[in-house]
A protein has these predicted regions:
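Noncatalytic, basic helical substrate-engagement surface that gates or grips nucleic-acid strands
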Residues: 1-119, 125-143, 235-254
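Long, compositionally biased intrinsically disordered regions
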Residues: 299-300
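Accessory alpha-helical DNA-binding modules that contact the DNA backbone or grooves
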Residues: 156-159, 167-243, 262-266, 270-285, ...
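Short, charged, surface-exposed secondary-structure boundary motifs
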Residues: 143-153
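Conserved active-site carboxylates
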Residues: 162
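Alpha-helix N-cap/helix-start motif at coil-to-helix transitions, marked by capping-box chemistry
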Residues: 70-77, 154, 224-227
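C-terminal/domain-terminus segments
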Residues: 253-263
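Acidic, divalent-metal-coordinating active-site segment for phosphoryl/phosphodiester hydrolysis
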Residues: 123-124, 183
Length: 300
C-alpha cells in the first residue's frame, strides 16, 4: 500500500500544531467539482494540473496513471481515517475549493477569535490578512501580517486581489498581463499600498484619465477583460458560496471537536507500518495532540 502522502501530511500537521499551539485546528480540502465555478469563468483554470496528484507521491513507480490514481484515492481515504482519530475539524465541501472554505470560516470566526493563523503557501490568502488574520508560509518559514505583506509587495492586503489580477498565478494556470509587472504596478498604481480598497472601477477611471501620461494605462484598458476575469477568479473575499453550503460549513464547525483516539490511531499506525517515520508514537501523540484534545473537550 502507498502511504507516502499520509506520513508527510501527518508529520506536517503535527509540526504546525506543536509550533503554534492553537486552541482549534481546522483542515480544509477541495471538494468534489470544487473548481467548477471558476472553470465556468475561465475554462482553462487549473488545466495545468490535470495529471497532478493531490497528495505527495511516494517513491514508487506506477505502471499506469490509473494505478497512481487508485493509490491516491486510497491515501486520501486512509488519511481521513487517521484524521478521525485526532482532535481536528476537517472539511471538503462539494462545489467549492479549500480556499473558499477557509475564507468563509475565517470570516465567520473573525470577531470571536483572538488570532487566526492560516497555514498555506498560497498567496491568495494574503488578501485576508488583517489585525486578526495572519498567514504562515511553511516553505518560506515566514509569517505574513499586514506589515509583512506591505514590506514584501508594497501592496496592502486589501488590494492584493487587484495586484494579483495583473500578475496572474501560474500554479492555477491564470495568465497575467504581459508587460505590467510588480515594479510597473508600484510606479503607476501607488494607491494599492493604501488600506483603502481600490476597485476595478477606480482602476478603469484612472486609466482613462491618464492615457497621455503613460502607455501603461492604455495597456491596462486593452487588457481590462483579463484583469476583471482574474479578479473574479482570485477573489476569495467575495464568498460566492451557495447558502446551503455555508449552512453545512457552519453546522460542521458547530459540532463538538473529536477527542484524541489513541487506540484507533495506533491500530492504523501499526497496520500501515509507519514506525520508520515516527520513532516514538506515544510521545508524538502526547506532545502534539494532548493540549488540543483538552480544548476539544470543552466543546462537548
Amino acid at each position: 500500500d502507498h502511504i507516502g502522502g499520509i506520513t508527510g501530511f501527518l508529520y506536517s500537521i503535527g509540526k504546525t500544531v506543536r509550533d503554534f499551539k492553537p486552541s482549534r485546528c481546522v483542515i480544509a480540502f477541495d471538494g468534489q467539482r470544487g473548481s467548477a465555478r471558476r472553470k465556468s469563468i475561465y475554462k482553462d483554470y487549473k488545466a495545468n494540473r490535470a495529471n497532478k496528484t493531490k497528495l505527495r507521491r511516494h517513491d514508487h513507480h506506477f505502471t499506469t496513471i490509473e494505478d497512481e490514481q487508485v493509490a491516491m484515492r486510497f491515501q486520501f481515504s486512509r488519511l481521513v481515517s487517521y484524521l478521525d482519530c485526532l482532535p481536528v475539524t476537517f472539511l471538503a465541501m462539494d462545489g467549492i475549493e479549500a480556499d473558499d472554505t477557509i475564507a468563509y470560516i475565517a470570516d465567520q470566526y473573525h470577531d470571536k477569535s483572538k488570532k487566526i493563523t492560516i497555514v498555506s503557501t498560497d498567496r491568495d490568502f494574503y488578501q485576508l490578512v488583517d489585525d486578526k488574520i495572519q498567514v504562515w508560509s511553511p516553505i518560506k518559514k515566514k509569517m505574513y501580517d499586514t506589515q509583512t505583506v506591505l514590506e514584501e509587495f508594497n501592496i496592502h492586503p486589501n488590494n492584493m486581489v487587484l495586484y494579483r489580477s495583473f500578475t496572474g498565478d501560474k500554479s492555477d494556470n491564470i495568465p497575467g498581463v504581459s508587460g505590467i509587472g510588480p515594479k510597473t504596478i508600484q510606479k503607476h498604481l501607488p494607491e494599492l499600498a493604501a488600506d483603502k480598497l481600490y476597485t476595478l472601477e477606480d482602476l478603469q477611471k484612472k486609466s482613462k484619465s491618464n492615457l497621455n501620461e503613460s502607455k501603461t494605462y492604455q495597456k491596462i484598458l486593452d487588457n481590462f477583460d483579463t484583469i476583471e476575469q482574474n479578479y473574479k477568479l482570485m477573489n476569495i473575499k467575495l464568498l460566492n458560496i451557495p447558502a446551503a453550503t455555508c449552512s453545512k460549513i457552519r453546522g460542521i464547525m458547530a459540532q463538538p471537536v473529536p477527542m484524541l483516539d489513541r487506540k484507533e490511531f495506533q491500530r492504523l499506525f501499526y497496520e500501515d507500518k509507519m514506525w520508520s517515520v515516527m520513532k516514538n508514537l506515544p510521545d508524538w501523540l502526547t506532545n502534539t495532540w494532548l493540549s488540543l484534545s483538552a480544548f476539544a473537550k470543552q466543546t462537548h
